[in-house]
Amino acid sequence: MIEDIQEDADRRMAKAVESLKHDLARLRTGRAHTSLLDQVNVEYYGMEVPIKQAANVSVEDSRTLAVTPFEKHMVPAIEKAIMASNLGLSPVSAGQVIRVPLPSLTEDRRKEMVRLVKNEAEQARVAIRNVRRDANSDLKDLAKGKDITEDEERRAQEAIQKLTDRYVAQVDDLLEEKERELMEV
């Protein structure tokens, strides 16, 4: 019973951290990385598919992505999809390769992005604390029903708190790393 509650809490906290990682990867930092285009879909044989399924996306240099379509006729469609993606990118076609230069971020935009990142991190922390609250509530219910002793409840709550601390520390590390990345010029 206690193990089930702890495993569930661990799984849900890990999910909150994964969600934060996913959200942070979408934010543009001014440095090229392939995950920047993960959310971009292109029409490929009548279906909307992620750009990765129609082209090879690679980092050419710190400010440029290279998109190489698997099929030559996909170049205009991929170019159009990147422009329509609301990422503020302007792809340049060079034969079979589409180069996507990343404009540098202004100081105001960097600060706004840091604010966004801090907000995302706080939401992840709140989600982790909510999982802790739910787990502790479940433990209290077990103790009230005399299914576990008070000592077992206290030990389990301490274990849940250690889990919470570990995942909140991961969130803080992700936040710090992303802030540093954003403020780099």
Curated annotation (Swiss-Prot):
Q: Which Pfam families match?
A: RRF
Keyword entries, A-Z: Cytoplasm, Protein biosynthesis
**Origin superkingdom:** Bacteria
GO BP annotations of the record are: cytoplasmic translational termination
The Gene Ontology terms for molecular function here are:
ribosomal large subunit binding
List localization entries: Cytoplasm
**Protein biosynthesis recorded as keyword:** yes
Kindly state one GO CC term assigned in the UniProt record: cytosol
Task: Please tell me where this protein is predominantly located.
Answer: cytoplasm
Q: Which PANTHER family match?
A: MITOCHONDRIAL RIBOSOME RECYCLING FACTOR PSEUDO 1, RIBOSOME RECYCLING FACTOR
Q: Which family does it belong to?
A: Belongs to the RRF family.
Q: What does this protein do?
A: Responsible for the release of ribosomes from messenger RNA at the termination of protein biosynthesis. May increase the efficiency of translation by recycling ribosomes from one round of translation to another.
Q: What is this protein called?
A: Ribosome-recycling factor
Taxonomic source organism: Halorhodospira halophila (strain DSM 244 / SL1) (Ectothiorhodospira halophila (strain DSM 244 / SL1))
The coding gene here is frr
